[in-house]
């Protein structure tokens, strides 16, 4: 599946294995580049849906991953892979109720 956004100047590409659309990967291509400088690959990020965004982010933090954009809204967070790729984590279904410690966490770096 492909979705063009003229106003936002980006394209979303949704990839899934044949006959298994439940394991979908979203690729974001920014038409004007991503302004990340040298070594940039001109795409925005990878996005994954998870069953519980708070549990997922806690597990990532417990394993040394920096949560660059905490899930303050119970719906969306961002981290970076070891090689600098931005990864969006999305709550499957409705957003969870906002809760601590996420609600008070500041953004770290860029995502």
Label each residue range with its predicted role.
Residues 13-16, 83-85, 104:
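Short low-complexity, flexible loop/linker segments enriched in glycine and/or proline
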Residues 19-22, 29-86, 91:
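Vicinal oxygen chelate
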Residues 6-7, 75, 99:
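Positions that flank functional sites
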Residues 1-22:
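Core segments of cupin and vicinal oxygen chelate
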Residues 2-3, 43-48, 90-111:
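N-terminal beta-strand motif that seeds the catalytic metal site of vicinal oxygen chelate
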Residues 1, 10-11, 30-37, 97-98:
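A short, acidic/glycine-rich surface segment
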Residues 17, 69-70, 97-100:
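Intrinsic-disorder/low-complexity coil detector
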């Amino acid at each position: 599946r492909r979705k063009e956004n003229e106003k936002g100047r980006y394209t979303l590409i949704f990839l899934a294995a044949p006959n298994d659309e439940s394991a979908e990967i979203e690729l974001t291509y920014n038409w004007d580049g991503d302004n990340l400088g040298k070594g940039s690959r001109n795409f925005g990020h990878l996005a994954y849906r998870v069953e519980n965004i708070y549990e997922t982010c806690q597990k990532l933090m417990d394993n040394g991953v920096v949560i660059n954009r905490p899930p303050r809204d119970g719906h969306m967070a961002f981290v970076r892979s070891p090689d600098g790729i931005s990864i969006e984590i999305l709550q499957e279904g409705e957003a969870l109720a906002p809760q601590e410690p996420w609600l008070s966490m500041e953004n770290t770096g860029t995502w």
